[in-house]
């Protein structure tokens, strides 16, 4: 039979061996590839409109841009047309924009009304006084003739009133003739004013000649009436 106490020293010796043993060294981690810079959306132009220097990649060549990657997959970029290959160069760089337009030169407040008067878009000006459409300023020197002045009393061109025959009719006719003479003397129109121009002078001269003619006819009529009255009184004075 084996002694149980003999196993105890063996187990104890194994535990001591495990504690004294060092763990094996760990293998070194695998080398990681170096990080490549992230390509910008506009690799040829930065925020200050300056060309960006090209950076070398891990293998010494220029970094692959996003546009080249798209072209390698078969997509057409903005710089490639239907007849251009993926290896063609990009489009030329855009020129920097100029300064934004300002509010413009200031205008003096004194020149405002003058420029408004000279604006040709206001439309045609209304014609001046005395101008007629189609004849501007033609009637300014020739105003229309004034209407003839009204004549007081008997002007001489009134229709003759026939008096009834007989002694009563002759007396009434005589009274009317006497009244007509007085009215003619009171209502005699003044002489016409001197003509100012050719047109108005011709009109006034014709009116004056007509008035003179009518006045002569009226005087003849009054004279004939007076002669008739004298004969009538003579007949009344003689006994029949």
Swiss-Prot record:
Residues 22-37, 89-106 have a biased composition (Pro residues). Its main location: host cell. Keywords: Early protein, Host cytoplasm, Host G2/M cell cycle arrest by virus, Host nucleus, Host-virus interaction, Modulation of host cell cycle by virus, Phosphoprotein. GO terms for biological process: symbiont-mediated arrest of host cell cycle during G2/M transition. Residues 67-76, 167-176 have a biased composition (Basic and acidic residues). GO terms for cellular component: host cell cytoplasm; host cell nucleus. Residues 1-204 are annotated as: Disordered. It is found in: Host cytoplasm; Host nucleus. Phosphorylated by host ERK. The phosphorylation triggers a structural change that enhances keratin binding and protein stability. The keyword Cell wall biogenesis/degradation does not apply. The keyword Flavoprotein does not apply. Contributes to multiple aspects of the viral life cycle including viral genome amplification, suppression of suprabasal cell differentiation and egress of newly formed virions. Induces host cell cycle arrest at the G2 phase by associating with and preventing the nuclear entry of host CDK1/cyclin B1 complexes. Inhibits cellular DNA replication by preventing loading of host replication licensing proteins MCM2 and MCM7 onto chromatin. Within the cytoplasm, associates with host kinase SRPK1, a splicing factor regulator, and inhibits its activity. Belongs to the papillomaviridae E4 protein family. The major E4 form is first synthesized as an E1^E4 fusion protein from spliced E1^E4 transcripts, such that the first few amino acids of the E4 protein are derived from the N terminus of E1. Assembles into oligomeric complexes. Interacts with host CDK1. Interacts with host SRPK1; this interaction may favor expression of late viral transcripts. Interacts with host cytokeratin components KRT8 and KRT18. This is Protein E4. It comes from Human papillomavirus 5. The lineage of its organism: Viruses, Monodnaviria, Shotokuvirae, Cossaviricota, Papovaviricetes.
């Amino acid at each position: 039979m084996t002694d149980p106490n003999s196993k105890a020293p063996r187990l104890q010796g194994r535990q001591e061996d495990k504690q004294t043993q060092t763990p094996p060294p760990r293998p070194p981690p695998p080398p990681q590839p170096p990080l490549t810079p992230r390509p910008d959306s506009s690799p040829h132009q930065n925020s200050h409109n300056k060309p960006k220097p090209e950076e070398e990649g891990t293998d010494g060549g220029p970094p692959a841009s996003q546009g080249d990657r798209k072209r390698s997959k078969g997509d057409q970029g903005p710089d490639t047309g239907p007849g251009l290959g993926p290896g063609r160069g990009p489009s030329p760089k855009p020129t920097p924009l100029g300064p934004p337009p300002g509010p413009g030169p200031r205008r003096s407040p004194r020149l405002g009304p003058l420029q408004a008067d000279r604006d040709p878009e206001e439309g045609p000006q209304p014609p001046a006084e005395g101008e007629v459409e189609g004849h501007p300023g033609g009637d300014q020197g020739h105003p229309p003739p004034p209407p003839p002045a009204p004549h007081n009393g008997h002007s001489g061109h009134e229709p003759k009133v026939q008096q009834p025959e007989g002694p009563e009719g002759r007396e009434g006719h005589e009274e009317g003739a006497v009244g007509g003479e007085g009215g003619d003397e009171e209502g005699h129109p003044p002489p016409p004013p001197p003509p100012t121009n050719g047109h108005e002078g011709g009109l006034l001269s014709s009116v004056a000649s007509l008035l003179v003619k009518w006045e002569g006819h009226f005087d003849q009529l009054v004279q004939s009436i007076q002669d008739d009255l004298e004969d009538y009184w003579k007949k009344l004075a003689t006994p029949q």
